[in-house]
């Protein structure tokens, strides 16, 4: 078998739609129709989390939503902790014991629905919230299971908005709102945090943002306007801060609006929907996701969520102690990959056993859409040199293969699919 001293290969883009790690659809955690989505969405009420003061229902919650199974499958969570979800019946979303200690919120029956809006400025409420949030974070852990945390806690649906024009106790002032946000920042150091609006805190702390009116042009344009120019919130004309380039460092999430039909968003006005997604640089949508029965729209939306990584070129050169490898990696998606997960090259034998692993000096969070990075490493040893055996026409006879993978630290498995036309095996993409 002959050996050459150099080898170059290029790879075409795979333009198909597919789920991928940390991006795409985030259906409800207890749905039976999640398909192959890599994310799940958990809306957790305080009432469910802490039924008695200081007594947390973590074991029941973990079992109810199958957390152990999700972790094993490599599925990650989007979580929103909420205190007020408008419904069809009068109800409480905070625990009875907490209501008994406060009672200074507002029972309501509005066009949003029925429920109870707490007084979030209440000192007892704030102290109890601090405790439950840290307990929740400790329960969920720091293994990366929770990828995204949407703030959460304040307002109807946790969206930091109260229908105070209907006489409800209004949102607290910025100082108190910032206390809530600071608790989230401290409690969830390994997750990406997202706020509903570009508050000053979000801009200063480089947080992400989410849009729960995705697909609705007027509301999304207003949301994008806040991001571009800042604006009013309540009585403060400067509470919303311009942060037009935030998506380069922090993610965009949200869900489809309930004000439009799937037929409208995924068929009739699909181009409009896709345009709104693209200019928003979204990474995930949930829990209201596209319906799979609208296959064209479902896939078109999925394809526009998040990063799309491709090795565009590989160059191998024989060197004294092995093979030098130079790769050009491009991001052809709408957003960066926000986690610094290890990107590895692997030399494998024909049975798929890993003979050599080398981490690439590739910074995924810095790889912006439309950009590429060129990285070089040395694959040491005779096994790597055998990658240059044969010739392009005789590659099938080469005793070694070169693969690339991006490892999810939660599972220690390769989890990211590259958007390129190449064979895949065990979560890795085959380069040679």
Task: Provide a role label for each language-model segment.
Residues 105-110, 167-194, 210-231:
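Acidic, His- and aromatic-enriched active-site or binding-groove loops in soluble protein domains
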Residues 52-54, 160-172:
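Short, flexible/disordered intra-domain loops and linkers
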Residues 2-121, 241-293:
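N-terminal substrate-binding region of glycoside hydrolase catalytic domains
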Residues 198-202, 209-312:
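Substrate-binding cleft of secreted/luminal carbohydrate-active enzymes
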Residues 303-432:
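Extracellular/luminal regions of secreted and cell-surface proteins that mediate adhesion/ECM remodeling
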Residues 48-50, 85-94, 155-161, 201-205, ...:
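Short catalytic/ligand-binding loop motif for oxyanion handling, primarily in non-cytosolic enzymes
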Residues 145-156, 177-205:
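Aromatic-lined carbohydrate-recognition surfaces of secreted/lumenal glycan-active proteins
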Residues 65-71, 100-150, 176-183:
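An active-site-proximal structural segment forming one wall of the substrate-binding cleft
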